[in-house]
Amino acid sequence: MNRDVYENCRKFLKKYPGTIAWRVKKHASVIQRHINDDEVVLYTFIGQKDTMLIQPFFTTVIVFTNKRMLLGRKKYLGRSFYTSITPDMLNDFEIRTGLFFGSIEIDTVKEHFIINGLSKKSLGEIEDSISKYLINEKIKILKNRKETNE
């Protein structure tokens, strides 16, 4: 699978042009720096994190790899925001549709966050990708626990 996060973001935005996102190349570079050589990018999307306002300050790139979930946002003046979440920390997610845009609320053990400004057409693909990711990772976790108990 393609490891180029920016290219994956561009494909997502081309497929779903109603998604709100600014400075995509800068935000993608935050994630690109943190992807390890042995990781494979499974799914990438982009939206506005934890805000109901549509501003360039909150655009965030979300990447699912074969090992973890990554969130990255490039702030101004050289600062950046980066979060890495392992699959065992993910609980569930919720899809919401509004009048013009959709949103996804992802719940983890420590926090939950909302990604807004998503094209309503993109929600089905995002839901399918996150569901498959969660199911596959939970199966791996259960198998590992079973093997360690034996």
Q: Where would I find each of the regions flagged by the language model?
A:
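Glycine/small-residue-rich phosphate/adenosyl-binding loop
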Residues: 36
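Polybasic phosphoinositide-binding surfaces of eukaryotic membrane-targeting domains
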Residues: 57-71
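Flexible glycine-/small-residue-rich
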Residues: 47, 66, 73, 108
